[in-house]
């Protein structure tokens, strides 16, 4: 799965640029995955909780994603790619929240060990992003299409080897998910997650283009993406200790503030390679510790039969709504204000998320 992400996220925008699409068109196409995340994870999560089985749905989603993706080989028109990517994203974006639920279901009370499982996804990302970086410097960008196809075939095969966890009943099972969502702690978490994903909109849409435009080779681009994920792996390994030292909520607040610093560094210091490297190391916080703490907090708030819906809601609000908003804003800002200002604006979303989380969190809820 994350080898696919390591192939698609850094390089797909370069493929779209090679087809002659404008910056805003690229932003729209890249945002389709976030658009689908607004409703698809919650829909499939509801179905999984209703049926009481997650793994068969994961298998169906993997198969339907594979069939949808084949459409990219048939035409390169903007309207066709729009339709294909929207259909693909509807199936693909729903699988990760279900996998998160399955993983946390197997871990039980040992949720602080989540990072040790998730780091294997990061390793897959690194191998894909570095390998393709070198290959795309040598071969035509269309090689990317076949590499992504290989990743999706592998996901489909491995989905049939995932064990189904036992769903543990909880006293909140009889309650409504709306009652959980209206809790101030949950609202604070969702607001913060929306802002963090909005901050990353420009990063996931234009970062590779931004680096190439400033003279970095595709191999260098691959290594920079990989460096961020290596830092992410290290933070995943340290999360059990960090959680005991600081708690999940403090980790989330710190991660949001670091996003403000990171995207300003990328925006204003792209020509200083050592600053770019340092900014990528900060991915450990802006994704690694942020995501691990957000997933764990979601798992704490949504129990029993609400677990899949909870993870789906987290994905919908953050990567769906927040990612779509951030991606579309970045597409407009890129053409209106330029690349550096776009990254600086994105940093403000991280700062706003930090302030919102602290402001909305109930006084009795210890940070």
Question: Each predicted region: which residue ranges?
Answer:
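Helix-loop boundary and gating motifs at the non-cytosolic
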Residues: 1-34, 186-192, 197-224
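Helix-to-loop junctions at the C-terminal end of transmembrane segments
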Residues: 39-53, 136-137, 234-248, 334-335
């Amino acid at each position: 799965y994350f080898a696919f992400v390591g192939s698609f996220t850094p390089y797909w925008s370069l493929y779209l640029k090679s087809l002659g699409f404008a910056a805003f068109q690229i932003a729209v196409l890249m945002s389709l995955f976030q658009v689908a995340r607004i409703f698809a994870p919650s829909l499939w999560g509801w179905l999984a909780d209703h049926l009481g089985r997650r793994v068969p749905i994961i298998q169906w989603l993997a198969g339907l994603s594979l069939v949808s993706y084949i459409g990219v080989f048939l035409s390169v028109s903007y309207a066709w790619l729009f339709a294909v990517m929207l259909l693909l994203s509807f199936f693909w974006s729903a699988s990760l929240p279900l996998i998160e639920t399955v993983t946390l279901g197997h871990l039980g009370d040992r949720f602080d060990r989540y990072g040790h499982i998730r780091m294997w996804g990061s390793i897959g990302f690194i191998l894909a992003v570095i390998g393709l970086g070198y290959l795309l410097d040598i071969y035509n960008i269309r090689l990317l299409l076949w590499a992504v196809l290989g990743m999706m075939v592998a996901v489909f095969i491995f989905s049939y080897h995932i064990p189904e966890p036992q769903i543990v009943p909880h006293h909140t099972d009889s309650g409504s998910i709306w009652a959980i969502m209206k809790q101030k702690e949950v609202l604070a978490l969702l607001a913060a997650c929306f802002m963090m994903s909005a901050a990353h909109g420009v990063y996931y849409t234009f970062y590779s283009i931004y680096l190439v435009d400033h003279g970095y080779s595709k191999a260098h681009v691959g290594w920079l993406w990989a460096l961020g994920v290596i830092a992410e792996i290290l933070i995943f390994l340290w999360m059990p200790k960090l959680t005991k030292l600081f708690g999940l909520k403090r980790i989330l607040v710190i991660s949001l503030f670091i996003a403000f610093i990171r995207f300003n560094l990328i925006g204003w210091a792209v020509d200083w390679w050592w600053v770019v490297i340092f900014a990528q190391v900060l991915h450990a916080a802006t994704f690694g510790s942020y995501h691990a703490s957000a997933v764990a907090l979601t798992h704490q708030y949504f129990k029993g039969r609400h677990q899949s819906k909870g993870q789906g809601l987290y994905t919908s609000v953050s990567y769906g709504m927040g990612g779509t908003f951030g991606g579309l804003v970045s597409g407009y800002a890129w053409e209106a204000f330029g690349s550096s200002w776009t990254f600086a604006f994105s940093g403000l979303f991280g700062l706003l998320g930090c302030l919102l989380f602290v402001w909305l969190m109930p006084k009795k809820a210890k940070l």
